Structures are given as structure tokens and as C-alpha cells.
């Protein structure tokens, strides 16, 4: 299931990223990111996949709709072995 506009905005906020940060990470224009987040543009599947993959690589986990609505959370950092 593709990410939703709300999930993109929540994920960006969880990472404390600006629209510019996400645009630079994905190679997309800031206006594209903004238009997706405010619902003016649903985003084509390839664009949403690029956004999802970059956010996942940064530590975001996407939560499917399970009665409470779709959401995001940050992965717990893994402990380094000494």
C-alpha cells in the first residue's frame, strides 16, 4: 500500500526534516513534496516509492491502517556490540 500524504508529513516531522531536507534526500522538487503533503497531488507510484524508501532508510517505519488509521514511528536504534 502506498504511503499517504499524512504519513509523509508525519515521517518528516518525526525526523525533524524540513521540506527542503526531504526534497534533497529524494531528488524531488520541494513543491512536489509540499503538494503531496497538503493533498494537492496524490503522487504517482514511483514518486511515492522514492519518498517511502528514503524515509525508511532514515529510520522511519510505516504503520498500515489497522483500525486506528495509518501512521509512522521511528525504529529503535540497535545496540552496538562492543
Predicted regions and their residues:
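Helix-turn-helix/homeodomain-like alpha-helical modules used for DNA recognition
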Residues: 60-82
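A detector for short, charged/polar N-terminal pre-domain segments
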Residues: 1-3
